[in-house]
Amino acid sequence: MFEQEQQDAVRVVEEFLKQAKLKKGDLVVIGCSTSEIASHRIGSYSNADLGEAVFLAMQGAFAKEEISIATQCCEHLNRALIIERKDAERFGYEEVNVVPQPKAGGSFSTAAWKHMQEPVAVEHIQAKGGIDIGDTLIGMHLRAVAVPVRIEQMDLNREKS
């Protein structure tokens, strides 16, 4: 299930990495609305299975390049971020006490919490790059100067409802 979305997610990461000029150990923030992937209004159609499928595909693609990731939760958790503890410590980010759920944090960040080795939530980061799937507004978690990149893969196999 969701094979097309996984393939598309890997293509997004590959195209992004070709343009973004990141190095091993850099941090990327990912915001992802499963509602938007499924052609619904953001926040209205959270899908845990879709979030998990897309997260695992993207996590694997970034891991191959040794790029660290953080996932942005939704506004119910004040857009907190889920990140590996080792990365939070390496970058000096302060941990906050929240745990994402599909309808409070988002399905994508819930999957991150489930599949990261030692996940923690942090309030803010300054990532070197970011991918925003579904207009989740990740800009607050990027460095002050960020250059947008345009990729060919614009959608993750949008279903029609």
Regions found by a protein language model. Give the residues of each.
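N-terminal glycine-/serine-/threonine-rich phosphate-binding loop
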Residues: 1-28, 48-61
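Non-transmembrane, aqueous-exposed alpha-helical and coiled segments at domain scale
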Residues: 10, 24-27, 35-45, 57-99
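A generic local secondary-structure boundary/capping motif
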Residues: 19, 59, 100, 146-153
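Generic, ordered loop/turn and secondary-structure boundary motif
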Residues: 23, 38, 43-46, 132, ...
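General beta-strand structural signal in soluble alpha/beta enzymes
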Residues: 30, 69-73, 121-125
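Low-complexity, flexible helical/coil segments
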Residues: 62-69, 105-110, 161
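A glycine-rich helix N-cap at a beta->alpha junction
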Residues: 91-118
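Glycine-rich, aromatic-bearing surface loops/beta-hairpins
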Residues: 110, 114-161
